[in-house]
């Protein structure tokens, strides 16, 4: 019980610190399925009470659900006529650059998840 509370505290801290949006996938266990692991939507197996990172999300395996929280901030308030956003999958971030000169960054006044 202490381990689970500790894990939930860590997840809550990550969510709060990153201002992340989360989704919860309730688990439907089959009679022959192990109860000490989770199976994600891609068929990946994860040990109970563990974290992993996939597709720019942090995920956590609980006994009844998998919780995944995005860690990507999306620029929303910038000059959309003069500038465009670029996604960098290697570090799950966006940059906003000029359309005519992609080497020059544009100011961003607001971000969202």
Curated annotation (Swiss-Prot):
This is Beta-microseminoprotein. Homodimer; Interacts with PI16. GO terms for cellular component: extracellular region. Belongs to the beta-microseminoprotein family. It is found in: Secreted. It comes from the Eukaryota. Disulfide bonds join 22-69, 38-61, 56-92, 59-68, 83-106. Keywords: Disulfide bond, Secreted, Signal. The keyword GTP-binding does not apply. The keyword Secreted applies. Residues 1-20 form the signal peptide. The gene is Msmb. Its main location: secreted.
């Amino acid at each position: 019980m202490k381990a689970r509370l500790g894990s939930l505290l860590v997840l809550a801290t990550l969510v709060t610190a990153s201002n992340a949006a989360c989704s919860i996938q309730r688990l439907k266990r089959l009679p022959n399925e192990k109860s000490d692991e989770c199976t994600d939507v891609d068929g990946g197996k994860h040990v109970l009470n563990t974290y992993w990172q996939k597709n720019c999300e942090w995920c956590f395996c609980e006994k009844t659900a998998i919780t995944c929280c995005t860690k990507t901030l999306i620029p929303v308030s910038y000059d959309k006529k003069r500038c465009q956003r670029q996604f960098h999958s290697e570090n799950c971030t966006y940059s906003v650059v000029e359309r005519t000169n992609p080497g020059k960054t544009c100011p961003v006044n607001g971000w969202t998840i």
